[in-house]
Each structure stands twice: as structure tokens, then as C-alpha cells.
Design a protein with these regions (language model features):
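Positively charged n-region of N-terminal signal peptides that target proteins for export
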Residues: 1-7
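A residue-level marker of the well-folded mature domains of exported/periplasmic proteins
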Residues: 20-341
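N-terminal signal peptide c-region/cleavage motif recognized by signal peptidases
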Residues: 14-18
Length: 341
């Protein structure tokens, strides 16, 4: 009897070891966790990777392009089967891509484009995000002095977002209905840099700003701080669906936050990385299409998901999706916000 139990235990142990051996090692080179959304993404991504029986191996470069290259070198040397990169700098990441590709490791660029045919690109339609930010702010403020706060100049997303904004406001700028009184990048997408940009625009324009297009919610919040200090309350648009931004929408401080359902994005990344690790060619990833919208026009295989604009009129969308709680979103909300009643 004892020998039977021992034999059974050996079989179970052998099976468990075999199951673990079958799992793939998915390295994730995060650029930073400055924005709350990246921390949410990491949780959802890890959940999907582990649900599929694979191992999640993360690094965090803390906003340093040099550190991210070291992180990728370390991940590749540890024998990962697939690599997800949220690049700090789309150009500086090149040697990291070369290193991973030389080792035969498939690569997924996460929400920030790496314009390289060896890298699968997963993101939202960022040109569409730019359109939504500008369109909703323009509905509220169809003319006047606009300030535009761009993201980091090394991030292709900033270019895509600006392209979308231009599609909405370009004709009004050409026709003189809208005047851009200031436009500048906030290095690293950092709120403190965005606040400095906004303060300079206010100083240069004599506080004559009627609307602000910010390329993410952290920068929108920083712009609102500067506007408030100047005694101004104007339409401000951003994106990411950050909890603080959605609360500002409920309070009437921010006009729109374009929500990119990052849980879906992160889970999809975990799924795709698993497929790539298993040897699935990029062109056979479900829903993949060729994308040539980068600065160099290099064709890459990509999936672009659809974003959702969130205003005071439809805050229930993010609450019902369990993205945020009603309690968090509705603190100090305007009485007119139906989702907060």
C-alpha cells in the first residue's frame, strides 16, 4: 500500500513538473509606473499571463531608457520565450529589440509604438483618441484661444494624438475661429513638466486661454492646477480614464477623459504574448492587421482597439465596467451628474 501511495505521488509530482515546464516565460519590460493606469495594466496583464499557465517576469525602468536596455538584456539572458515592451523611448529601444530578435525572442510593443517590422504593435487607436479629446472640447468651446500640452517627444503616441486633434481643430484654426496661443511637449509625460508648460502659456498669453487639449489625464490635472491658480475655469480634455481625472469630470473640472479600457488591452497583451511564445506568426494572431501609420511608414502587424470618451453625461460606463467605484468617482460631484445620484 505504501509503495502504491509513493508511486502515485511520483506520478502526480511528475505531472505537475511537466505542466510547469510547459508554461512559457513572458518578460515584460515596463518603462515606468508614473501613471496609475500602468499599475492597473500590470495587474491585469499578470493575471492573464498566469491564467494561461505562463510565467510573468516584469522589470521597471523607472523612466530611464538606459535602464530599460539593461532590463531587456537581463530578461533575454534569463531565457524568456516572449517579450512585452512598454518603451521609454521609441528610438533608444532599438538595441534592445536587436538583442531580443537575435535570441529568437518574439516581441510585442505595448501601447507605445516601436516602428520595427519585428515587433507586434498593440494599442488603442491613438489618432482616434486625439480626435475625441479635441471634438468634445470643441463642442463646448468652438472658438477662442486654445493651449495644447503634448506628451514626450520621443513617444510616437504623442504624434498620433496630435494628428487626431489636428483633424478636428485644423479647419477652425485655418479659418481664425481658434487660435493656438501655446503648444509644447511635457518631457516624460510628467505632470510637473505639464504644469510648467501651462504656466508659461498663461504668462505668455496674459491668461487668455479658453480651452486646453492635454494628451493624458496626468497632464490635464496639472494644467487644471495652473488654470485654477490663475483664476480660470475652462474646458480641458485628457485621456486614460484615471480615477482622479474621472472625479474631476464629475466635479466639472475636466470636460472629458478618453477611456482606453486598459484591462482589455493588458489581457489581450498577455494572450498575444502567449501565442507568440508558442510560435504563432504575427500575421496569424487573431484580428491582426498591417499598420503603416508610424513616422517612417514601416508596415507592422498590429491590433488597434477602440477607445471610449467619458464625460459627465456617461460616467456610468466606467462605473458599470468596474473600472472605478461610484464612491471614488462621485466625491464632490455636480448635482447634475446622473451616475452619482
Amino acid at each position: 500500500m505504501r509503495s502504491l501511495i509513493l508511486a502515485a505521488a511520483l506520478v502526480i509530482t511528475s505531472f505537475a513538473s511537466g505542466a510547469l515546464a510547459e508554461g512559457k516565460r513572458i518578460g515584460v519590460a515596463w518603462g515606468d509606473f508614473q501613471e496609475a493606469r500602468w499599475r492597473w495594466d500590470a495587474t491585469a496583464m499578470r493575471s492573464m499571463i498566469e491564467r494561461n499557465g505562463n510565467k510573468y517576469i516584469p522589470t521597471n525602468a523607472g523612466g530611464s531608457a538606459e535602464q530599460q536596455l539593461r532590463d531587456i538584456e537581463k530578461l533575454v539572458s534569463e531565457g524568456i520565450d516572449a517579450l512585452i515592451i512598454q518603451p521609454v523611448d521609441k528610438e533608444a529601444i532599438g538595441p534592445g529589440v536587436d538583442r531580443a530578435a537575435a535570441a529568437g525572442v518574439p516581441i510585442l510593443g505595448y501601447d507605445r509604438m516601436i516602428e520595427d517590422e519585428r515587433v507586434f504593435y498593440l494599442t488603442f487607436d491613438n489618432v482616434g483618441v486625439g480626435r475625441l479629446i479635441a471634438a468634445i472640447v470643441k463642442q463646448v468651446q468652438p472658438e477662442g484661444n486654445y493651449a495644447i500640452i503634448l506628451g514626450d517627444p520621443s513617444d510616437a503616441n504623442s504624434t498620433f494624438l496630435r494628428q487626431g486633434m489636428e483633424e478636428i481643430i485644423g479647419a477652425a484654426v485655418a479659418g481664425g475661429q481658434i487660435t493656438i496661443v501655446g503648444e509644447a511637449n511635457a518631457d516624460g509625460w510628467k505632470p510637473e513638466n505639464a504644469k510648467a508648460v501651462m504656466e508659461k502659456i498663461l504668462a505668455d498669453s496674459g491668461n487668455k486661454v479658453d480651452a486646453v487639449l492635454a494628451q493624458n489625464d496626468g497632464m490635464a490635472g496639472a494644467a487644471i492646477e495652473a488654470l485654477t491658480s490663475a483664476g480660470l475655469s475652462v474646458p480641458v480634455g485628457g485621456q486614460d480614464g484615471d480615477k482622479a481625472a474621472l472625479n474631476r469630470v464629475a466635479q466639472g473640472l475636466q470636460t472629458v477623459s478618453v477611456w482606453k479600457n486598459n484591462f482589455d488591452l493588458a489581457k489581450r497583451a498577455g494572450q498575444i504574448a502567449g501565442l507568440l511564445a508558442d510560435g504563432t506568426p504575427m500575421n496569424l494572431i487573431p484580428d491582426a492587421k498591417q499598420f503603416t501609420g508610424g513616422e517612417k511608414g514601416i508596415p507592422v502587424w498590429a491590433i488597434l482597439l477602440t477607445p471610449t470618451p467619458v464625460t459627465a453625461e456617461n460616467l456610468d460606463v466606467v462605473i458599470d465596467a468596474d473600472h472605478v467605484t461610484k464612491q471614488d468617482v462621485c466625491k464632490g460631484a455636480m448635482p447634475s451628474v446622473a451616475a452619482c445620484r
